[in-house]
C-alpha cells in the first residue's frame, strides 16, 4: 500500500502558495492507518524507546497509537499554557518571533530513552525545540519520526545537526 495515496494535498493552505499535506484522509481510512502505524512501529522500535513524545497536536495522533503498539509511555509536548500543573518550557525562534513548547514537570524520568514524533517535518524548528526541551529535562533522545517529510526543506538537516536519527513514511520533494 502506498501511504501517499491516502494523504491529501490542499493548495493555498494556510496561505497562498503553500501546499498543505493533510493526514486527515489517512486517519479516515482504518486499513491505511493500520498499515501506516505498523510501518512506523517497525521503524520506531529500532530506536529502543522507553517513552514516545508527541508534538502538539497532530503528533499526538502518531505517538499515542504507537506507544500502545510498542508498550511505551506517551507524553505530550504542548504549546505554552496548554498543560496543567508545573511545566518546564523551552523558548525557540520562529521566522518572525518566538514560540514556546512545554512538558509537565516529572513527565519523563531523567535518562529515559525518548523518540519524538509529529505528523510532518518541514523546517524542523518545532521538532528541534522538542529535542532541546527533552534534553533539558535529562531525557536521551534516540530518534525522531513523522508520517511526512518535506525533503526540500531543512528539517532533516536540522535533526542531523542535533545528532538525532530520523525516519518517515512518505517523503515529498516539492
Curated annotation (Swiss-Prot):
Its EC number is 2.4.2.7. CDD domains: PRTases_typeI. Coiled coil: none annotated. GO terms for molecular function: adenine binding; adenine phosphoribosyltransferase activity; AMP binding. It catalyses: AMP + diphosphate = 5-phospho-alpha-D-ribose 1-diphosphate + adenine. Keywords: Cytoplasm, Glycosyltransferase, Purine salvage, Transferase. Pathway: Purine metabolism; AMP biosynthesis via salvage pathway; AMP from adenine: step 1/1. GO terms for biological process: adenine salvage; AMP salvage; purine ribonucleoside salvage. GO terms for cellular component: cytoplasm. It is an enzyme of class 2 (transferase). The keyword Transferase applies. Pfam families: Pribosyltran (PF00156). It is found in: Cytoplasm. Its main location: cytoplasm. The keyword Transferase applies. Belongs to the purine/pyrimidine phosphoribosyltransferase family. Catalyzes a salvage reaction resulting in the formation of AMP, that is energically less costly than de novo synthesis. Homodimer. This is Adenine phosphoribosyltransferase. The gene is apt.
Amino acid at each position: 500500500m502506498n501511504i501517499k495515496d491516502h494523504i491529501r494535498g490542499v493548495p493555498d493552505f494556510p496561505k497562498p502558495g503553500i501546499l498543505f499535506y493533510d493526514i486527515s484522509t489517512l486517519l479516515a481510512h482504518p486499513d491505511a492507518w493500520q498499515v501506516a502505524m505498523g510501518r512506523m512501529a517497525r521503524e520506531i522500535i529500532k530506536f529502543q524507546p522507553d517513552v514516545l513524545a508527541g508534538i502538539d497536536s497532530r503528533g499526538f495522533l502518531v505517538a499515542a497509537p504507537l506507544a500502545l503498539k510498542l508498550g511505551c509511555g506517551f507524553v505530550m509536548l504542548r504549546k505554552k499554557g496548554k498543560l496543567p500543573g508545573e511545566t518546564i518550557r523551552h523558548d525557540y525562534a520562529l521566522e518572525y518571533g518566538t514560540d514556546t513548547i512545554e512538558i509537565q514537570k516529572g513527565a519523563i524520568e531523567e535518562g529515559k530513552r525518548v523518540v519524538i514524533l509529529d505528523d510532518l517535518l518541514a523546517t524542523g524548528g518545532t521538532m528541534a525545540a522538542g529535542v532541546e526541551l527533552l534534553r533539558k529535562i535529562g531525557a536521551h533522545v534516540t530518534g525522531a519520526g513523522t508520517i511526512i517529510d518535506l525533503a526540500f526543506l531543512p528539517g532533516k538537516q536540522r535533526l542531523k545537526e542535533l545528532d538525532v536519527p530520523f525516519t518517515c513514511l512518505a517523503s515529498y520533494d516539492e
